[in-house]
Swiss-Prot record:
This is TNF receptor-associated factor 6. SUPFAM superfamilies: RING/U-box (SSF57850), TRAF domain-like (SSF49599). The gene is traf6. Belongs to the TNF receptor-associated factor family. A subfamily. Pfam families: TRAF-mep_MATH (PF21355), TRAF6_Z2 (PF18048), zf-C3HC4_2 (PF13923), zf-TRAF (PF02176). It comes from Xenopus tropicalis. Homotrimer. Homooligomer. The coiled coil domain mediates homo- and hetero-oligomerization. The MATH/TRAF domain binds to receptor cytoplasmic domains. CDD domains: MATH_TRAF6, mRING-HC-C3HC3D_TRAF6.
Length: 558
């Protein structure tokens, strides 16, 4: 006899109904059946007694689709902890209990009277539902499994969502490690200057206050670490504005530190007058004033001698005329000494200015020599590339920001040679503005010829093949460089022998690469874009031996 059709009897006269009632009671007492474990009723493996009463049906995708007989009429999902009513309807345990408590003691389907103690577990339906196959709910996973094994699968599924412990965002399990160590804005990094650990998103704020970061002096453009800058401003910077050292005597001039000596020389007399005026004011302020009492000739009592105690006090607190005269004499001697010191300092300043001018001339000569050597070194380095040149464009994000703000971005690389001897070339990169017609937001890349050391030895125009690439800097995966190959066109001015330092005519691609494509791969790494240029000229392909040339045989042994 099927449990699905049993109906408990309240009159005790129907033996079949009584049997069904007994079986229902047995099912209510013991939910184990056919050797199933207590965890069979829940994919999570929890015993039935621990299942929360407010959990609705299984909201998963079945394969094949779920039959309607296994759907809960209340939540319209697969039955969870299926129970059956005396009227033969199935519900999720949590759904029907909530319905009875909220809507009254009746069946939601046919409004038959229904009490909580009349519900009994439908283990047959429960076992059938747990045996149905479902699709993994994780996006990207194509596996299917029985419903009873879903929770176990989710524990090991590489597509299941897991939370990043650093930024609390959810990611597929297979990409979590890459996110934590390469992409997470909260991943830990170390300051390259002071080695302090911080989150990546805090790096910008730290860089603005890092005591060991290099900063540029706003006056002389010298690069120093931040903690040295206050001392540099107050003592060393030759361009920093400072007040005259005689500002306490009244000089209000301000000048750059390297102009202080000239100012002291030009205003020596003025400074001396200021000092003399200050000292005279000080001297007059200490000149003794009359402490004689006011005498009224109409009052004879004023001529009476004062009591001895009053005279003593008066003499104690009043400086004598001799003391004031001595102090004035001392002040005059001090003025004479300071005037002599000013004269000596004036001579010293003149000597220092002469020495400084000599040193400045020498420094300028050294700068010119260093600049020449630097240019020569750059020229030698450009000759060593042998036709393969890699251009490192630093601070590329700032260039992108300028482009977004409609500010033109055009930069040229340093020159390089195709060989030794060889043609001298350079690259030009242009970020097209968002408002540009037909090429908005594109990277334009061109090649220009330059005047080189071997131009008189080379055939013109330049002929050969040029390969331009923007390098993919990804690690651990197959790199996908953005690459274009072009052949030179001798009839164009771009490949003729240049008559100026850099040929204004270039040859290349206006729409070499869209800026959005930079985000698809790691073309920009550490704020740096790498552009590669490989040039193969016809000189590299032609044999140096002239056609028809016959090598001379040896003269033989003597």
């Amino acid at each position: 006899m099927s449990i699905l059709n049993c109906r408990p009897s309240f009159d005790g006269v129907d033996t079949d109904d009584a049997c069904c009632g007994a079986m229902a009671s047995a099912c209510c007492v013991n939910t184990k059946e056919d050797g199933e474990s207590p965890s069979a009723g829940s994919p999570s493996g929890t015993p039935q007694s621990l299942v929360l009463e407010d959990v609705q049906g299984y909201d998963v995708e079945f394969d094949p689709p779920l039959e309607s007989k296994y759907e809960c009429p209340i939540c319209l999902m697969a039955l969870r902890e299926a129970v059956q009513t005396p009227c033969g309807h199935r519900f999720c345990k949590a759904c029907i209990l909530k319905s009875i408590r909220d809507a009254g003691h009746k069946c939601p389907v046919d409004n038959e009277s229904l009490m909580e103690n009349q519900l009994f577990p439908d283990n047959f339906a429960k076992r059938e539902i747990l045996s149905l196959r479902v699709k993994c709910p994780s996006q990207g996973c194509t596996e299917t499994m029985e419903l009873r094994h879903l929770e176990r699968h989710l524990v090991r599924c590489d597509f299941a969502g897991v939370e990043c412990s650093q930024c609390q965002s959810s990611f597929p399990k297979y990409s979590l490690q890459k996110h934590k160590f390469e992409e997470c804005p909260r991943r830990q990094i170390f300051c390259e200057n002071c080695a302090v650990a911080m989150a990546l998103e805090d790096k910008l704020n730290h860089d603005q206050t890092c005591p060991l970061a290099y900063v540029t002096c706003e006056y002389c453009q010298t690069n120093l670490i931040r903690e040295q800058m206050p001392a540099h401003y107050s003592m060393d910077c030759t361009m920093a504005p400072i007040p005259c050292m005689y500002y306490e005597f009244g000089c209000t001039e301000k000048m750059q530190r390297n102009d202080l000596a000239r100012h002291l020389q030009e205003f020596t007399q003025a400074h001396m007058r200021m000092m003399a005026q200050t000292l005279r004011s000080f001297s007059s302020s200490v000149t003794p004033t009359s402490h004689m009492p006011d005498i009224s000739f109409c009052d004879p009592s004023q001529f009476e001698p004062a009591p001895p105690s009053v005279a003593t006090v008066h003499s104690t607190h009043t400086p004598s005329q001799n003391d004031c005269t001595q102090e004035t004499r001392n002040l005059r001697e001090t003025i004479e000494q300071l005037e002599g010191r000013l004269v000596r300092q004036d001579h010293q300043i003149r000597e220092l200015i002469a020495k400084m001018e000599t040193q400045c001339t020498y420094v300028n000569e050294l700068k010119h020599t260093i600049r020449s050597l630097d240019n020569r070194l750059g020229e030698m380095e450009s000759q060593q590339c042998s036709g393969i040149f890699i251009w490192r464009i630093n601070n590329f994000n700032s260039l992108l920001k300028n482009q977004e703000e409609e500010r033109p971005v055009v930069i040229h690389s340093q020159g390089f040679y195709t060989g030794k001897p060889g043609y001298k070339l350079c690259l030009r990169l242009h970020l097209q503005l968002p408002s540009a017609q037909r090429c908005a937001n594109y990277i334009s890349l061109f090649v220009h010829t330059m005047q080189g050391e071997y131009d008189s030895l080379l055939p013109w125009p330049l002929q050969g093949t040029i390969r331009l690439s923007i390098l993919d800097q990804s690690e651990g995966v197959a790199m996908q460089d953005q690459e274009e190959v072009m052949d030179t066109k001798p009839e164009l001015l771009a490949f003729q022998r240049p008559t100026v330092a850099r040929n204004p005519k270039g040859f290349g691609y206006v729409t070499f690469m869209h800026l959005q494509a930079l985000k698809q791969r790691q073309y920009v790494k550490n704020d740096t874009l790498l552009v590669r240029c490989s040039v193969t000229t016809h000189l590299d392909l032609i044999s140096p031996r002239r056609e028809g040339f016959q090598p001379r045989s040896g003269d033989g042994a003597l």
